[in-house]
Protein backbone atom coordinates (compact mmCIF):
# COMPACT_ATOMS: atom_id res chain seq x y z
CA UNK A 1 0.00 0.00 0.00
CA UNK A 2 2.82 2.38 0.91
CA UNK A 3 4.47 1.70 -2.45
CA UNK A 4 1.24 2.53 -4.28
CA UNK A 5 0.86 5.79 -2.35
CA UNK A 6 4.49 6.66 -3.07
CA UNK A 7 4.00 6.01 -6.78
CA UNK A 8 0.86 8.15 -6.84
CA UNK A 9 2.65 11.00 -5.06
CA UNK A 10 5.58 10.74 -7.47
CA UNK A 11 3.21 10.86 -10.44
CA UNK A 12 1.40 13.89 -9.01
CA UNK A 13 4.76 15.61 -8.51
CA UNK A 14 5.84 14.96 -12.11
CA UNK A 15 2.52 16.16 -13.49
CA UNK A 16 2.64 19.25 -11.30
CA UNK A 17 6.14 20.11 -12.47
CA UNK A 18 5.07 19.61 -16.09
CA UNK A 19 2.09 21.91 -15.57
CA UNK A 20 4.34 24.54 -14.04
CA UNK A 21 6.71 24.28 -17.01
CA UNK A 22 3.82 24.67 -19.42
CA UNK A 23 2.61 27.70 -17.48
CA UNK A 24 6.00 29.44 -17.62
CA UNK A 25 6.26 32.45 -19.89
CA UNK A 26 8.89 34.89 -21.08
CA UNK A 27 12.36 34.60 -19.57
CA UNK A 28 11.11 31.84 -17.24
CA UNK A 29 10.82 29.44 -20.18
CA UNK A 30 13.92 27.28 -19.99
CA UNK A 31 15.55 25.33 -22.79
CA UNK A 32 15.88 21.55 -22.79
CA UNK A 33 19.37 21.41 -24.30
CA UNK A 34 18.21 20.46 -27.79
CA UNK A 35 20.62 22.13 -30.22
CA UNK A 36 19.17 25.03 -32.21
CA UNK A 37 20.84 26.49 -35.28
CA UNK A 38 20.20 30.20 -35.56
CA UNK A 39 20.86 32.50 -38.52
CA UNK A 40 21.21 36.23 -37.91
CA UNK A 41 22.67 39.45 -39.26
CA UNK A 42 22.72 40.81 -35.71
CA UNK A 43 25.60 38.83 -34.25
CA UNK A 44 28.50 41.24 -34.66
CA UNK A 45 30.16 43.39 -31.98
CA UNK A 46 29.98 40.50 -29.51
CA UNK A 47 26.24 39.91 -29.87
CA UNK A 48 26.48 36.27 -30.96
CA UNK A 49 28.86 35.35 -28.14
CA UNK A 50 26.76 37.17 -25.56
CA UNK A 51 23.55 35.49 -26.70
CA UNK A 52 25.09 32.03 -26.79
CA UNK A 53 26.43 32.40 -23.24
CA UNK A 54 23.28 34.04 -21.85
CA UNK A 55 21.00 31.46 -23.44
CA UNK A 56 23.12 28.62 -22.06
CA UNK A 57 22.42 29.92 -18.56
CA UNK A 58 18.76 29.11 -19.18
CA UNK A 59 19.26 25.75 -20.83
CA UNK A 60 19.50 26.67 -24.52
CA UNK A 61 22.18 25.15 -26.75
CA UNK A 62 22.72 27.53 -29.68
CA UNK A 63 24.81 27.36 -32.83
CA UNK A 64 24.79 30.85 -34.34
CA UNK A 65 25.60 31.63 -37.97
CA UNK A 66 26.20 35.36 -38.46
CA UNK A 67 26.19 37.07 -41.88
CA UNK A 68 24.85 40.23 -43.47
CA UNK A 69 21.08 40.52 -43.87
CA UNK A 70 21.16 39.85 -47.61
CA UNK A 71 23.51 36.91 -47.14
CA UNK A 72 21.21 35.34 -44.54
CA UNK A 73 18.29 35.79 -46.91
CA UNK A 74 20.16 34.23 -49.83
CA UNK A 75 21.45 31.34 -47.69
CA UNK A 76 17.91 30.42 -46.65
CA UNK A 77 16.72 30.62 -50.25
CA UNK A 78 19.60 28.54 -51.60
CA UNK A 79 19.42 25.88 -48.89
CA UNK A 80 15.68 25.44 -49.29
CA UNK A 81 14.24 22.48 -47.41
CA UNK A 82 17.75 21.24 -46.60
CA UNK A 83 18.56 24.21 -44.38
CA UNK A 84 19.76 23.31 -40.88
CA UNK A 85 18.36 26.62 -39.61
CA UNK A 86 15.72 26.46 -36.89
CA UNK A 87 15.34 30.13 -35.96
CA UNK A 88 16.28 33.37 -37.69
CA UNK A 89 16.42 36.79 -36.06
CA UNK A 90 17.36 40.33 -37.04
CA UNK A 91 16.79 41.24 -40.75
CA UNK A 92 14.21 43.87 -41.76
CA UNK A 93 10.69 44.18 -43.15
CA UNK A 94 11.84 43.91 -46.77
CA UNK A 95 13.52 40.56 -46.18
CA UNK A 96 10.84 39.26 -43.83
CA UNK A 97 8.18 39.81 -46.50
CA UNK A 98 10.33 38.08 -49.11
CA UNK A 99 10.88 35.03 -46.86
CA UNK A 100 7.14 34.86 -46.15
CA UNK A 101 6.35 35.02 -49.87
CA UNK A 102 8.81 32.17 -50.49
CA UNK A 103 7.13 30.00 -47.82
CA UNK A 104 10.35 29.73 -45.80
CA UNK A 105 8.86 30.71 -42.42
CA UNK A 106 6.08 29.15 -40.37
CA UNK A 107 3.35 31.16 -38.66
CA UNK A 108 3.24 30.55 -34.91
CA UNK A 109 0.90 31.41 -32.07
CA UNK A 110 1.73 34.78 -30.56
CA UNK A 111 4.27 34.58 -27.74
CA UNK A 112 3.14 35.96 -24.38
CA UNK A 113 5.09 39.19 -24.96
CA UNK A 114 3.60 39.99 -28.38
CA UNK A 115 1.15 42.54 -26.95
CA UNK A 116 4.06 44.37 -25.28
CA UNK A 117 5.53 45.21 -28.70
CA UNK A 118 4.87 48.62 -30.25
CA UNK A 119 1.75 48.54 -32.41
CA UNK A 120 2.21 47.60 -36.06
CA UNK A 121 5.67 46.02 -35.76
CA UNK A 122 4.72 42.33 -35.48
CA UNK A 123 3.69 40.48 -38.61
CA UNK A 124 -0.13 40.45 -38.56
CA UNK A 125 -0.19 36.81 -39.65
CA UNK A 126 2.27 35.57 -37.04
CA UNK A 127 5.28 34.82 -39.23
CA UNK A 128 7.67 37.04 -37.26
CA UNK A 129 7.58 39.04 -34.05
CA UNK A 130 9.53 42.25 -33.51
CA UNK A 131 12.41 42.43 -31.03
CA UNK A 132 14.41 45.55 -31.97
CA UNK A 133 13.55 48.63 -33.97
CA UNK A 134 16.09 50.78 -35.77
CA UNK A 135 15.20 54.20 -37.11
CA UNK A 136 16.93 54.74 -40.47
CA UNK A 137 18.21 58.27 -40.23
CA UNK A 138 19.48 61.04 -42.49
CA UNK A 139 22.41 61.85 -40.22
CA UNK A 140 24.96 64.65 -40.15
CA UNK A 141 27.85 65.89 -38.02
CA UNK A 142 26.32 68.57 -35.81
CA UNK A 143 29.81 69.81 -34.95
CA UNK A 144 30.06 71.01 -38.55
CA UNK A 145 26.41 71.64 -39.48
CA UNK A 146 23.83 73.31 -37.26
CA UNK A 147 20.22 72.08 -37.30
CA UNK A 148 19.31 75.22 -39.23
CA UNK A 149 21.94 74.47 -41.88
CA UNK A 150 21.28 70.74 -42.11
CA UNK A 151 18.88 69.02 -44.55
CA UNK A 152 15.35 68.47 -43.28
CA UNK A 153 14.55 65.51 -45.54
CA UNK A 154 16.20 63.36 -48.20
CA UNK A 155 15.01 65.41 -51.23
CA UNK A 156 16.92 68.42 -49.87
CA UNK A 157 20.14 66.62 -50.79
CA UNK A 158 19.56 66.80 -54.53
CA UNK A 159 17.15 69.75 -54.68
CA UNK A 160 19.40 72.20 -52.78
CA UNK A 161 22.80 72.87 -54.31
CA UNK A 162 24.42 73.63 -50.95
CA UNK A 163 24.31 69.91 -50.13
CA UNK A 164 25.81 68.66 -53.38
CA UNK A 165 28.94 66.52 -52.78
CA UNK A 166 28.42 66.85 -49.00
CA UNK A 167 26.50 63.59 -48.68
CA UNK A 168 27.72 60.07 -49.31
CA UNK A 169 26.48 58.12 -52.30
CA UNK A 170 26.48 54.33 -51.93
CA UNK A 171 28.50 52.16 -54.32
CA UNK A 172 26.76 48.93 -53.25
CA UNK A 173 23.02 48.40 -52.92
CA UNK A 174 22.99 45.10 -51.02
CA UNK A 175 22.95 46.46 -47.47
CA UNK A 176 19.78 46.56 -45.43
CA UNK A 177 20.18 50.21 -44.42
CA UNK A 178 20.76 51.33 -48.01
CA UNK A 179 17.72 49.44 -49.23
CA UNK A 180 15.57 50.95 -46.50
CA UNK A 181 16.71 54.42 -47.58
CA UNK A 182 15.88 53.68 -51.22
CA UNK A 183 12.49 52.27 -50.19
CA UNK A 184 11.78 55.43 -48.20
CA UNK A 185 12.51 57.59 -51.25
CA UNK A 186 10.95 55.53 -54.04
CA UNK A 187 7.67 54.74 -52.26
CA UNK A 188 6.91 58.47 -52.25
CA UNK A 189 6.46 58.11 -56.01
CA UNK A 190 4.36 54.95 -56.35
CA UNK A 191 2.58 54.77 -59.71
CA UNK A 192 0.99 51.48 -60.86
CA UNK A 193 1.51 52.60 -64.46
CA UNK A 194 5.12 53.64 -63.94
CA UNK A 195 8.22 51.58 -64.61
CA UNK A 196 8.50 48.96 -61.85
CA UNK A 197 5.60 50.71 -60.11
CA UNK A 198 7.42 54.06 -59.76
CA UNK A 199 6.60 57.30 -61.57
CA UNK A 200 8.99 59.06 -63.94
CA UNK A 201 9.34 61.79 -61.31
CA UNK A 202 10.53 59.18 -58.82
CA UNK A 203 13.18 57.79 -61.13
CA UNK A 204 14.36 61.31 -61.94
CA UNK A 205 14.69 61.96 -58.20
CA UNK A 206 16.81 58.83 -57.74
CA UNK A 207 18.96 59.87 -60.67
CA UNK A 208 19.58 63.27 -59.08
CA UNK A 209 20.25 61.65 -55.71
CA UNK A 210 23.11 59.58 -57.10
CA UNK A 211 24.36 62.32 -59.42
CA UNK A 212 25.11 64.85 -56.68
CA UNK A 213 26.54 62.68 -53.89
CA UNK A 214 30.16 61.76 -53.19
CA UNK A 215 30.66 58.02 -53.78
CA UNK A 216 31.67 56.31 -50.56
CA UNK A 217 35.05 54.59 -50.47
CA UNK A 218 34.68 50.85 -50.14
CA UNK A 219 35.21 49.87 -46.50
CA UNK A 220 35.24 53.47 -45.23
CA UNK A 221 32.28 54.31 -43.00
CA UNK A 222 30.34 57.56 -42.95
CA UNK A 223 31.87 58.85 -39.72
CA UNK A 224 35.42 58.28 -40.92
CA UNK A 225 34.56 60.57 -43.81
CA UNK A 226 33.00 63.16 -41.50
CA UNK A 227 36.21 63.55 -39.49
CA UNK A 228 38.50 63.42 -42.54
CA UNK A 229 39.52 66.98 -43.43
CA UNK A 230 40.13 65.89 -47.02
CA UNK A 231 36.57 64.57 -47.46
CA UNK A 232 33.63 66.88 -48.22
CA UNK A 233 31.16 64.38 -46.73
CA UNK A 234 29.20 65.55 -43.67
CA UNK A 235 25.86 63.80 -44.29
CA UNK A 236 24.63 60.26 -44.91
CA UNK A 237 22.55 57.30 -43.85
CA UNK A 238 22.78 55.76 -40.38
CA UNK A 239 20.78 53.32 -38.27
CA UNK A 240 19.82 54.63 -34.84
CA UNK A 241 21.86 52.31 -32.61
CA UNK A 242 24.91 52.88 -34.80
CA UNK A 243 24.82 56.62 -34.17
CA UNK A 244 25.76 56.28 -30.50
CA UNK A 245 28.51 53.78 -31.25
CA UNK A 246 30.10 55.95 -33.94
CA UNK A 247 29.78 59.12 -31.88
CA UNK A 248 31.79 57.44 -29.15
CA UNK A 249 34.33 56.02 -31.60
CA UNK A 250 34.97 59.20 -33.61
CA UNK A 251 34.10 62.03 -31.24
CA UNK A 252 31.26 63.15 -33.49
CA UNK A 253 27.86 64.40 -32.32
CA UNK A 254 25.18 63.01 -34.60
CA UNK A 255 22.39 65.28 -35.71
CA UNK A 256 19.53 63.93 -37.78
CA UNK A 257 16.61 65.10 -39.89
CA UNK A 258 13.03 64.63 -38.71
CA UNK A 259 11.07 64.53 -41.99
CA UNK A 260 7.37 65.34 -41.96
CA UNK A 261 6.69 61.98 -43.63
CA UNK A 262 8.58 60.12 -40.90
CA UNK A 263 11.48 57.71 -41.35
CA UNK A 264 11.78 54.07 -42.39
CA UNK A 265 12.24 51.61 -39.56
CA UNK A 266 14.24 48.42 -39.83
CA UNK A 267 12.19 46.01 -37.76
CA UNK A 268 14.43 43.28 -36.43
CA UNK A 269 12.34 40.26 -35.61
CA UNK A 270 12.50 36.60 -34.68
CA UNK A 271 10.89 33.76 -36.60
CA UNK A 272 10.90 29.99 -36.94
CA UNK A 273 11.94 28.31 -40.18
CA UNK A 274 9.23 26.09 -41.61
CA UNK A 275 11.48 23.03 -42.03
CA UNK A 276 12.79 22.95 -38.46
CA UNK A 277 12.89 19.55 -36.82
CA UNK A 278 13.07 21.18 -33.39
CA UNK A 279 9.86 23.19 -33.41
CA UNK A 280 9.05 22.90 -29.69
CA UNK A 281 12.51 24.04 -28.63
CA UNK A 282 12.46 26.80 -31.24
CA UNK A 283 9.14 28.04 -29.91
CA UNK A 284 10.50 28.01 -26.36
CA UNK A 285 13.48 30.07 -27.52
CA UNK A 286 11.25 32.65 -29.23
CA UNK A 287 9.20 32.98 -26.04
CA UNK A 288 12.39 33.45 -24.00
CA UNK A 289 14.36 35.69 -26.37
CA UNK A 290 11.67 38.28 -27.05
CA UNK A 291 10.69 38.72 -23.42
CA UNK A 292 11.06 42.10 -21.72
CA UNK A 293 13.72 40.66 -19.41
CA UNK A 294 16.03 39.34 -22.13
CA UNK A 295 15.44 42.22 -24.54
CA UNK A 296 16.14 44.64 -21.69
CA UNK A 297 19.46 42.92 -21.03
CA UNK A 298 20.25 42.99 -24.77
CA UNK A 299 19.47 46.72 -24.90
CA UNK A 300 21.69 47.50 -21.92
CA UNK A 301 24.54 45.53 -23.46
CA UNK A 302 24.31 46.80 -27.05
CA UNK A 303 22.47 50.16 -26.84
CA UNK A 304 19.53 49.06 -28.98
CA UNK A 305 15.91 50.16 -28.87
CA UNK A 306 13.67 47.23 -27.91
CA UNK A 307 10.41 46.78 -29.76
CA UNK A 308 9.08 45.46 -26.43
CA UNK A 309 7.81 48.56 -24.64
CA UNK A 310 8.35 47.03 -21.20
CA UNK A 311 12.05 46.69 -22.03
CA UNK A 312 12.33 50.22 -23.41
CA UNK A 313 13.24 51.70 -20.02
CA UNK A 314 16.58 49.90 -20.33
CA UNK A 315 17.39 51.73 -23.58
CA UNK A 316 19.67 54.80 -23.62
CA UNK A 317 17.86 58.14 -23.68
CA UNK A 318 19.35 58.89 -27.10
CA UNK A 319 17.79 55.73 -28.55
CA UNK A 320 14.42 56.55 -27.06
CA UNK A 321 14.58 60.01 -28.64
CA UNK A 322 15.69 58.79 -32.08
CA UNK A 323 13.09 56.04 -32.17
CA UNK A 324 10.31 58.44 -31.20
CA UNK A 325 10.35 59.80 -34.77
CA UNK A 326 7.11 58.66 -36.47
CA UNK A 327 7.42 55.76 -38.89
CA UNK A 328 7.06 56.53 -42.58
CA UNK A 329 4.03 54.89 -44.19
CA UNK A 330 5.65 52.33 -46.50
CA UNK A 331 4.06 49.39 -48.31
CA UNK A 332 6.70 46.82 -47.36
CA UNK A 333 5.09 44.05 -49.41
CA UNK A 334 5.43 46.27 -52.49
CA UNK A 335 9.05 46.98 -51.59
CA UNK A 336 9.87 43.30 -51.04
CA UNK A 337 8.39 42.41 -54.42
CA UNK A 338 10.35 45.10 -56.29
CA UNK A 339 13.51 46.04 -54.40
CA UNK A 340 15.83 43.76 -56.39
CA UNK A 341 14.55 45.14 -59.70
CA UNK A 342 14.75 48.71 -58.39
CA UNK A 343 18.35 48.22 -57.33
CA UNK A 344 19.27 46.61 -60.64
CA UNK A 345 17.85 49.59 -62.54
CA UNK A 346 19.68 52.04 -60.28
CA UNK A 347 23.00 50.24 -60.70
CA UNK A 348 22.67 50.09 -64.48
CA UNK A 349 21.31 53.57 -65.11
CA UNK A 350 22.16 55.95 -62.26
CA UNK A 351 25.29 54.90 -60.40
CA UNK A 352 28.48 56.57 -61.56
What does each of the following model-derived ranges do?
Residues 1-35, 352:
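Short, low-complexity disordered leader/linker segments with a strong preference
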Residues 25-97:
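Early extracytoplasmic/lumenal segment of secretory-pathway proteins
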Residues 37, 41-48, 84-85, 90-227:
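Extracytoplasmic ligand-binding site segments that recognize negatively charged/polar headgroups
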Residues 84-90, 215, 232-239, 255:
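Paired acidic/hydrophobic, glycine-rich loop segments that form the ligand-binding mouth/hinge
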Residues 94-98, 233-253:
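A ligand-binding cleft/hinge motif common to bilobed small-molecule-binding domains
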Residues 115, 134, 205-209, 250-274:
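Periplasmic-binding protein-like
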Residues 263-264, 268, 273-330:
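Mature extracytoplasmic/periplasmic domains
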Residues 315-352:
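Extracellular/periplasmic bilobal clamshell ligand-binding domains
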Amino acid sequence: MKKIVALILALVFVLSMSALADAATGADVKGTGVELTIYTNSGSSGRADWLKERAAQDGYNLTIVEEGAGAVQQRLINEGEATPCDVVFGLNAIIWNDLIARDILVAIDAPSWADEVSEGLNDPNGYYYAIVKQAILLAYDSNQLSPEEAPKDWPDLWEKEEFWTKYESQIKLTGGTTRNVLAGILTRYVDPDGELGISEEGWNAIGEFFAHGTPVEDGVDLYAQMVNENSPVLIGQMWSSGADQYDEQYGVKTGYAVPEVGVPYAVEGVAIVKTTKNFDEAQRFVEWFGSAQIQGEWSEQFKTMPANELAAEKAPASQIEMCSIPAQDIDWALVAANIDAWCEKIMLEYMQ
